[in-house]
Amino acid sequence: APHAWLDIDNAGVTERATSHLLDLGHRHIALLNGPKGMTFALHRDAGYRAAFAARGLSPNPALIHNGAFTDETGFRLAQSLIERTPRPTAFVAGSMMTALGVFRAVRSAGMQLGKEVSMIAHDDVFPYLNADNMVPSMSTTRSSIRAAGTRIGELLGQLLGGKPPGEIHELWPVELVLRESSGPVQD
């Protein structure tokens, strides 16, 4: 039976974020994605690959990783990737928590975010993690969890009112907010 759903455009926004980094000259872009098999992670992976394909390029599979959205996972993955040759010049982080770990790894390697390494993080909607207040400020994607929750409540009302689940499919656009953490590739 068809299901009702509401989702954000994970593929589209990851393609836009990756495209932006490619346009800045980055070619070694690490994707720190969510857990393997999760629908959103599959969509983000597809968006990342589509950005490369649109330019006739292929991403380096060694720079694509899946894992939990934690500071520790971001730190460990980024630390090991930074030691690689060639190292990534940019990261697409699947969450702000992952991005915090990448930020720590970049700093501990003596590099500056937005200069030697760029990053765009997904989801800056956490009230306790303000991307504008970070130094440097974090380039992020943004979608309103609160608005989605409100809309899901409305859609549940429609389902209870007899609307067929197969008629309720909403894909929401996601904003890309560019700040200081994403800069041109350094020679």
Regions found by a protein language model. Name each.
Residues 22-25, 82:
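Non-catalytic positions within long, well-ordered alpha-helices that form the structural scaffold/packing
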Residues 27-29, 59-63, 113-119:
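Short acidic capping loops at alpha-helix termini that bridge into adjacent secondary structure
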Residues 25-28, 60, 86-87, 137:
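Short loop/turn motifs at secondary-structure junctions
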Residues 1-2, 19:
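Acidic, Gly/Pro-rich loop/turn segments at junctions of secondary structure
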